[in-house]
């Protein structure tokens, strides 16, 4: 059966299966969702068995369980390892959602729910493409699946799992759908990702919250001090001020800059979509260069003092912030993390104490476009979307990708189908039904073209 017809005839079932996953709030960041994490893993096991794998199992790790499945056609044939994650980000702030984030809604040609894109929707693309090639006798290579439940918290258990199961996960290429395209009419293959380093900072002043009338102006306010310290992290040119931070940053070649400049990009539409009047970043680089190929520093959260209803004139004892750096290829996240700890600590005046807790991080990644698997993915996009995809680096991070290469010795093809407008990690996450269909078609074509 032709793939478009198969998708059309089975779409209601596909969406019902996706809904069965979305109903499970598999939020890895919250310990109260441990049972949901386990339930989602079990549901994926069932769905992969129904799709045609020979075996599937939920495997324990030092953290959340992983789902492993395989279809072995021939032990001597090439093997594709499909990676995804079944955990999702918290849905807060709930009041900004137009519908229940864990009740899937189909509206305006889009799927609306937490996980609709990241990554339950994109994982379903992989599962249904696999189902099609198996049921139609087109699969000529082995396929393995590994779905984890901790990607949204930095995959803390996956590294050890990879080391302990190298033989089980042995493959010739890894296929991932957890990235985005440049646009619905502008398909693209991700050839690079930024790395990540992340910290939580606690600034302490007095030993208790104080009356701001009695102590204000005489005692340092930790919130004020923390804001001053954060402000010193970048200079007037948008560059990060940590000494030595840029030592390992590889400058973009003229060819790369020319390629990025050739991408159709409307800066006014970009600003309008996120409702900002102007853009800001590192001087000397375009927006597309800044958000994909250059490092960045961001405050991700800041709090302290009284945040309840009404007013309370208080000089707080403590202030907190969460901060991150997106890193580029060749920057080591552990090295950068230590540099940040040393530098940020040095910015603190003697009137406060600073505690810095490094959190999750990961390396950047670059994929050669000469790989046979890349060419197969390229053919898949061209078949489904009617045009050859652009090869672009993206600004997001999937920390485990570099570990795949380091531990398993295998490159990864980042064959993602999301859009910036999908609002992943935000209220009203959504995923285009048209792209969902085309994604299945593209991955089917990948399997038909990949010869190892």
Label each PLM-derived region with a short phrase.
Residues 1-94, 318, 335:
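N-terminal helical capping/dimerization or prosegment-like subdomains
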Residues 77-147, 438:
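Active-site metal-coordination/substrate-binding segment of hydrolases
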Residues 183-184, 241-318, 326-342, 347, ...:
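An extended, acidic, His-containing surface patch that forms the Zn2+-binding/catalytic region
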Residues 216-237:
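A short core secondary-structure module
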Residues 86-88, 110, 146-154, 177-181, ...:
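Acidic, glycine-rich active-site loops and adjacent beta-strand->loop/helix elements
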Residues 188-204:
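Flexible glycine/proline-rich, aromatic-decorated loop/lid segments
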Residues 117-192:
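Acidic/histidine-rich catalytic neighborhood of metal-dependent amide-processing enzymes
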């Amino acid at each position: 059966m032709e793939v478009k017809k198969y998708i059309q005839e089975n779409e209601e079932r596909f969406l019902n299966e996706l809904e069965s996953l979305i109903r499970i709030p598999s939020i890895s960041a919250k310990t109260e969702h441990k049972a949901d994490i386990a339930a989602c893993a079990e549901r994926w096991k069932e769905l992969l068995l129904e799709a045609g794998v020979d075996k599937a199992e939920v495997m324990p790790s030092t953290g959340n369980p992983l789902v492993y499945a395989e279809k072995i056609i021939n032990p001597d044939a090439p093997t594709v390892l499909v990676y995804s994650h079944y955990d999702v980000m918290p849905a807060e702030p709930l009041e900004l959602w137009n519908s229940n984030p864990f009740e899937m809604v189909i509206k305006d040609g889009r799927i609306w729910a937490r996980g609709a894109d990241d990554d339950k929707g994109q994982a379903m693309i992989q599962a249904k493409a696999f189902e099609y090639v198996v049921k139609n006798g087109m699969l000529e290579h082995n396929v393995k699946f590994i779905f984890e439940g901790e990607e949204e918290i930095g995959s803390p258990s996956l590294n050890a799992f990879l080391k302990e199961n190298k033989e089980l996960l042995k493959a010739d290429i890894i296929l991932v759908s957890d990235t985005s395209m440049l646009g619905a009419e502008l398909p693209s293959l991700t050839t690079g990702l930024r790395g990540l380093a992340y910290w939580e900072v606690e600034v302490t002043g007095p030993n208790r919250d104080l009356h701001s009338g009695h102590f204000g102006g005489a005692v340092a306010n930790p919130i004020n001090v923390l804001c001053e310290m954060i402000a010193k992290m970048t200079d007037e040119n948008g560059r990060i001020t940590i000494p030595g931070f840029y030592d390992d940053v590889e400058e973009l070649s003229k060819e790369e800059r020319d390629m990025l400049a050739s991408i159709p990009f409307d800066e006014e539409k970009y600003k309008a979509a996120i409702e900002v009047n102007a853009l800001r970043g590192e001087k000397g680089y375009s927006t597309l260069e800044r958000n994909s190929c250059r490092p960045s520093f961001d405050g991700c959260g800041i709090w302290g003092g009284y945040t309840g209803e009404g007013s309370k004139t208080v000089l707080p004892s403590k202030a907190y912030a969460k901060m991150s750096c997106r890193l580029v290829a060749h920057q080591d996240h552990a090295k950068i993390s230590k540099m940040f700890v040393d530098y940020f600590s040095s910015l603190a005046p003697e009137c406060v104490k600073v505690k810095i807790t490094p959190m999750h991080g990961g390396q950047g990644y670059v994929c050669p476009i000469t790989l046979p698997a890349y060419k197969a993915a390229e053919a898949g996009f061209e078949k489904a979307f009617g045009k050859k995809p652009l090869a672009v680096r993206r600004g997001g991070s999937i920390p485990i990708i570099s570990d795949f290469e380091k531990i398993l010795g295998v490159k990864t093809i980042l064959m993602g189908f999301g859009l910036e407008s999908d609002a992943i990690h935000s209220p009203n996450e959504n995923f285009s039904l048209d792209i969902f269909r085309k994604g299945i078609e593209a991955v089917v074509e990948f399997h038909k073209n990949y010869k190892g």
